[in-house]
Each structure stands twice: as structure tokens, then as C-alpha cells.
Amino acid sequence: MTISEARLSPQVNLLPIKRHSNEEVEETAAILKKRTIDNEKCKDSDPGFGSLQRRLLQQLYGTLPTDEKIIFTYLQDCQQEIDRIIKQSIIQKESHSVILVGPRQSYKTYLLDYELSLLQQSYKEQFITIRLNGFIHSEQTAINGIATQLEQQLQKIHGSEEKIDDTSLETISSGSLTEVFEKILLLLDSTTKTRNEDSGEVDRESITKITVVFIFDEIDTFAGPVRQTLLYNLFDMVEHSRVPVCIFGCTTKLNILEYLEKRVKSRFSQRVIYMPQIQNLDDMVDAVRNLLTVRSEISPWVSQWNETLEKELSDPRSNLNRHIRMNFETFRSLPTLKNSIIPLVATSKNFGSLCTAIKSCSFLDIYNKNQLSNNLTGRLQSLSDLELAILISAARVALRAKDGSFNFNLAYAEYEKMIKAINSRIPTVAPTTNVGTGQSTFSIDNTIKLWLKKDVKNVWENLVQLDFFTEKSAVGLRDNATAAFYASNYQFQGTMIPFDLRSYQMQIILQELRRIIPKSNMYYSWTQL
């Protein structure tokens, strides 16, 4: 090899990503299709079991008719309070504002939908519901969403043939925020539902104002230092509008009141409902009993299924009771337990296999094992060499930092230093002389390629998506709500923090990486400072 050829960068052989072949995908699809056909044949041969299975899945999915739904015991006090507030707004035409606080999947929106569905049967034309989500709507799109939903629901109440001429619904969302809310107030104040009631020879005309129910999911996203104009105008509607308005906000922030400005807080009713959680094992067992007990005689197997279920729940040594106890002592999450039971019911071919599955709970063991394989340790084993190198470099920087934080620039600088240290110990060029011709040649040993920073950015984003890194604002509690907002919102006063300067924290430390990474790995020596 000549000197000019030696100056060229060595060819890098990239390891291909292992993907499933088309044959494997087709084989898996064929197995699933065959299993589906077998299940359909079993349902056709035993229609009673098919009805029972569909009923159980409806109860687990929460898609039963409103009259047949069962509220869990630990949620009933909260449900009664929500029921009282909604009835005061819709029936007695009062205005209220409430915030529901609880973790995700704690049945906040479920209880609101349940109560509104019950009242929809008797007071269908006396209220409309407007739903907004902080993850979907910004302040401006929320105004457009309010206008669109008002138009659609008011036309349903008045009928598609009747036109509302007081305010142009097409231009309700145009103009400034103050003008928009003036149009909304004018529209709500002028919108009435007129009914003619015939009683013999006397015609009486009754006029009923329409209650507007706002449901805000993730209301805390509208409560930042620069995004509270929407909440201020809505809470001001509750105080001064002649039309009854009821606002329900759902959030996971325990200190939501600290997020509100003084002018917003002065118009808020200060009513906060904290969603109750399962406190003891009996509540968990009772919730599972309500989920799986069939209360209507839709199949000849119903009574036998209820007896089998009650026997398993009453026996403290049963496999089902063991899984309930394990969930209570670890996750304490009813949705997690429910998600593990759904495949058990859906894959049963007949009543005998369903009873056997609920007694053995072998499917629940497989499900839990599969979920645990999706933890950080399992994900770490799927990383490429470059991703692993960047992860270890970030962990080294985090261990040296006083607060355990790091950014992309610091992690890349550590990666660059470690790669150069390894390459410096590898002889790159070794001159040799050909005896016959007397010409000097060079043999080149392969060194580790140092990837450019622009190429590593994609790897960094993958590690963030895999939850190895978490933004510093999402870890721990802040001194106040304003500090939390500043930390989690990079766009403030027209400036934006660059991608490579955002602070992160590790979800797996360097000592844990040393225990997981095999000693044969080329980066194992990096796991120790």
C-alpha cells in the first residue's frame, strides 16, 4: 500500500440492524390468523360462551351502556361530589368551576363522562359539552375548538334546518381574545331552547337557558406565566355570564393552585377534588370483582362463571389472589392488572379454557414477564455500539457533575476524548520495506471511527425516546410553579434554548451499567472512572 493510499480513511463496516425477515412476519401472521379462525369456530359452536366473552371484554374495556356501568367502591364518594356539581349546573342553572387532581388513569375523565351520559338521557337539550386538551390545543387553537364545538352542538339542539342569526358562527373565532369571548357570551346569552307544551287547550311556552360544560384535560398546560389569558376569560365567564357555565379541569399537578395567577385565582372557586386511590387490598379485590362479575343473564354460563370467580377471589392462596396482592404491593395500579386480564379473556376458546386460565393465571405470569423485559436493562441490550458509547459517556459526565446533570455537548466531548484515548493506543501506520523492490509500504490497523457531532444527534434523540435520559425539568419537585414552567418550556420571551444545551439527567447510573454490560464488550473499561 502506498503512502497516498495510507492517508485515506479506513473503510468502516457498519453492522446491519437485525430485522425480521418476510418469512418470519408471514409465519407469525398465519399463526395469528389461524388462532382467530379457531376462536371464531368455537364461538359459533357455543354461542353462549361468545356472549359471555363479549360481555367480559365490554366490562374490561369500559364500553358497557351507561345504566349498566358499575363505579368502584373507593370512587363512589368522589362520584357523588361530581354528580352534585353537574346537577346544580345543568338542572338548577348554577355556575361552577372545579379542578380534579389525580395521577393518570385515575378515572377523572371516566367519571365526568359517566355523569354526563346519565344526564344526557333526561336533559339532552339543556346542556352542551366542550372538550379541550392541553396536549393538543394551544391558546389560539383552543379558541377555534370552542367556536367549532359550539357551532356543531348548538345546531344539533336547534336542528339542522334552523339557522342561528344572532351571531355569525363562522366568524366567532376571528379577532382578539377579548372580542372572541364577547362573541361567545353574546351567542350563549341569546341562545335559548323554546318548547311548546300542550296541556289540553292551554299552550305554555317555556324558555330554558343552555348550560355550557367545559372539560379541560391537562389544564396545567394553560396555566403558565404567558398562557393564562384563556383561563382568565373562562373563569370570568363563570362569575359574570348570565348563561350557566361549568368548568372541569383535569390535571396531575398536586400544586395546581400555585400555577394560577392572582387574577385567575380570584375568579376560581377554589374547589379542588383529589381523586381517591386504592388504600387497602380489600379495595383492590373488590374492584377486580366488579370488573369480572357478570350481572345480567346473557348466557347459561353466567352463574357458573360468577361462582368460579368468587371462589378464586375468596381463596387467599389462589393464583388470581396472588397476582392481585403482587400488584397491590408493587404498582398498585388497577389499569395494569386489567390490561393483563384482557388477553386472558380474549384468547380463551371455550368456557372450560377460560375457567382453567383464570385458575392457573399462567397468562398473567407471561404478561408480567413480558412487561418486565421492556425495562431499561432489556432496552440496554438492544443498543448499537455507538448508542452504548454515547450512553456511557453521558453517565461518566453525570457522575462527575455536582447535580448529576449533563447536556449533549458535554457528553459528546467525553465520547470524543475516550475514542481518541483508545485510538492513541492502536498503532495506525507500521512501515515495512519490500526486499525485492526496495519500496516502502504501510499496513494500517483498523481504529474506532469518531463520528461527527451532527451524526450523533440522531443517536441522542433515540436514547431520549428510550427513556435513558430525562429532561431535568421532569425530575423532582420545583420550588414553585413558575420555576417548573421556566424549566420545562424553552420558548420564553422570544428566545429558545438550543438542542445541545438542554439539561438532562440519567435514569441508569454508571455503576449499574458496569453490572449489565458484559466484560467482553469493548466499552466495558469506560464504565469505571
From Swiss-Prot:
Signal peptide: none annotated. It is found in: Nucleus. Pfam families: ORC4_C. Its main location: nucleus. Gene3D superfamilies: P-loop containing nucleotide triphosphate hydrolases (3.40.50.300). One of its GO terms (molecular function) is DNA replication origin binding. Keywords: DNA replication, DNA-binding, Nucleus, Phosphoprotein. The modification Phosphoserine is found at residue 9. GO terms for cellular component: DNA replication preinitiation complex; nuclear origin of replication recognition complex; nuclear pre-replicative complex; nucleoplasm; nucleus. The keyword Thylakoid does not apply. InterPro entries: ORC4 (IPR016527), ORC4_C (IPR032705), P-loop_NTPase (IPR027417). The keyword rRNA processing does not apply. One of its GO terms (biological process) is silent mating-type cassette heterochromatin formation. Component of the origin recognition complex (ORC) that binds origins of replication. It has a role in both chromosomal replication and mating type transcriptional silencing. Binds to the ARS consensus sequence (ACS) of origins of replication. Belongs to the ORC4 family. Component of the origin recognition complex (ORC) composed of at least ORC1, ORC2, ORC3, ORC4, ORC5 and ORC6. PANTHER family: ORIGIN RECOGNITION COMPLEX SUBUNIT 4 (PTHR12087:SF0). Present with 2170 molecules/cell in log phase SD medium. This is Origin recognition complex subunit 4. It comes from Saccharomyces cerevisiae (strain ATCC 204508 / S288c) (Baker's yeast). The lineage of its organism: Eukaryota, Fungi, Dikarya, Ascomycota, Saccharomycotina.
